[in-house]
């Protein structure tokens, strides 16, 4: 009797650049899970139809990336608490009763990566730069680690303020205008995509405390623009978002398959793939 091979995918537009098939294929091999995972381009105006067709044809679960995370949030018939708070969904799973549950594993992936690097979050002073979907998705998991304070700063201050109000019940959260952020922080997280265009947020370089950690959610070959700047101005450690990508994927895999794959070896393989080694 042939073993059934379950289908998973990632939906986005564009999607050619996605590392998710590479990651999940390695996860499947590592855990001996019979599955295939593909990258699927959904039309900008046809995400829901594409995902419905995928599940109707027997798909078990999928990841969702830009620009469809908010649409996936609306599409899901049930939501996890962290997806509700994130206001966006990056993981969908078809349940036995036919319902589709939506989850957001981004924040768990970030925290997992930071802890893997021995970054102490409990009692830390955390600065999050940016107030878009990427920031919103990680705030609750960061606050769950019990930092002393979490400050959100953003070019448009009102967006940072909205997030601070939304998450006030979960810890000490404040919003600050970029030009007023001058104190030192232990963990500085850049959730903006500025590094992709070689730009930097308009922030003072005095934000890096002794032994501080800089974390840029973007990644590429070598240090990102933000991490180069952070190291020049006193950050003791600097990490990019590749580990977060692997961490959120491991969390999605756990939701789908009920077991957590190891991330370290996969991250090494992915880094080699990215550097073209």
Swiss-Prot record:
Signal sequence bounds: none
Entry-linked Pfam families: SDH_C, Shikimate_DH, Shikimate_dh_N
GO cellular component, one term: cytosol
Source taxon at top rank: Bacteria
Amino-acid positions noted as binding NADP(+) in the UniProt annotation, renumbered to this chain: 81, 130-134, 154-159, 217, 241
Family annotation (CDD domains): NAD_bind_Shikimate_DH
UniProt keyword annotations, A-Z: Amino-acid biosynthesis, Aromatic amino acid biosynthesis, NADP, Oxidoreductase
Family annotation (SUPFAM superfamilies): Aminoacid dehydrogenase-like, N-terminal domain, NAD(P)-binding Rossmann-fold domains
EC top class, as a word: oxidoreductase
Protein name (database record): Shikimate dehydrogenase (NADP(+))
Taxonomic classification: Bacteria, Pseudomonadati, Pseudomonadota, Gammaproteobacteria, Vibrionales
Name of the coding gene: aroE
């Amino acid at each position: 009797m042939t073993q059934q091979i379950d289908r998973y995918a990632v939906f986005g537009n564009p999607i050619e650049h996605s590392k998710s098939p590479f990651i999940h294929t390695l996860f499947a091999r590592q855990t001996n899970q019979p599955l295939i995972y593909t990258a699927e381009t959904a039309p900008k105006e046809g995400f829901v139809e594409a995902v419905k067709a995928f599940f109707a044809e027997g798909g078990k679960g999928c990841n969702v990336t830009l620009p469809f995370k908010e649409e996936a949030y609306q599409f899901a018939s049930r939501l996890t608490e962290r997806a509700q708070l994130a206001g966006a969904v990056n993981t969908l799973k078809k349940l036995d009763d036919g319902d589709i549950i939506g989850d957001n594993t981004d924040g768990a992936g970030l925290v997992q990566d930071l802890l893997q690097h021995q970054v102490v979050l409990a009692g830390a002073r955390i600065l999050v730069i940016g107030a878009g979907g990427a920031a919103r998705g990680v705030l609750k998991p960061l606050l769950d680690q019990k930092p002393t304070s979490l400050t959100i700063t953003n070019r448009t201050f009102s967006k940072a303020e909205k997030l601070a109000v939304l998450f006030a019940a979960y810890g000490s959260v404040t919003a600050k205008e970029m030009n007023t952020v001058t104190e030192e922080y232990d963990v500085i997280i850049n959730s903006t995509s500025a590094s992709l265009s070689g730009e930097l947020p308009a922030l003072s370089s005095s934000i890096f405390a002794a032994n501080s950690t800089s974390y840029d959610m973007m990644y590429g070959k070598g240090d990102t623009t933000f991490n180069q700047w952070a190291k020049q101005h006193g950050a003791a450690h600097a990490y990019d978002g590749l580990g977060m990508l692997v961490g959120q994927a491991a969390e999605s895999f756990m939701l789908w398959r009920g077991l957590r794959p190891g991330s370290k070896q996969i991250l090494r393989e992915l880094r080699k793939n990215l550097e073209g080694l």
